Amino acid sequence: MLEESKNALRVFITGNPGVGKTTILLFLINKLSENNYKVAGFYCPEVRENGRRIGFRIVDITTNEGDWLAKENAPGRVKIGKYTVLEDSAKRITEITLSNINKADVLAIDEIGPMELKIPTIKKLIETILNNQKPLIAVLHRTQKPMGGRIYVITVENRDSIKYEILNYILSSLD
């Protein structure tokens, strides 16, 4: 899936569920933006109702536009576990993200995981981003194999300090 990229910055963030991987990615995106770097890509936050996860959204980083990716009890033909993929919504957001890639300095993905890789439009977007030579920051599901680059394993114990280590590494690599 990933073509060899010799010079591109590749940062992968992984760890168990709930340790703060998405929070760290959003922190990094915010700090890069503050340093005048344009970031494109997407993230897929979970949606909870009464403390229970009911689905996932997909959000374009550049425009902050989002829509449902997968939801419990939704009509549709593609099921992933207890969630139904809302293909039209996912496709609309992936098209927005694809249109922003060429304008970006840095690309970001949250997450490269089993669910995202089972959805054809998301899988194609992930492959497009991974094969791009621009710097990349990606959240990697704990079951996915490393893809080269630098890998940071996030834990509850290190999440507050490691985000600065990752940021410093990225900024020094971009300068």
From Swiss-Prot:
Protein purpose: Has nucleotide phosphatase activity towards ATP, GTP, CTP, TTP and UTP. May hydrolyze nucleoside diphosphates with lower efficiency.
EC numbers: 3.6.1.15
GO MF terms, alphabetically ordered: ATP binding; ATP hydrolysis activity
Family: Belongs to the THEP1 NTPase family.
Source organism: Saccharolobus solfataricus (strain ATCC 35092 / DSM 1617 / JCM 11322 / P2)
Protein name per UniProt: Nucleoside-triphosphatase THEP1
Keyword flag ATP-binding: yes
SUPFAM superfamilies attached to this UniProt entry: P-loop containing nucleoside triphosphate hydrolases
Pfam families: NTPase_1
Residue sites binding ATP per the record: 15-22, 106-113
Listed InterPro entries: AAA+_ATPase (IPR003593), Nuc-triphosphatase_THEP1 (IPR004948), P-loop_NTPase (IPR027417)
Catalytic function, reaction form: a ribonucleoside 5'-triphosphate + H2O = a ribonucleoside 5'-diphosphate + phosphate + H(+)
Keywords associated with the record: ATP-binding, Hydrolase, Nucleotide-binding
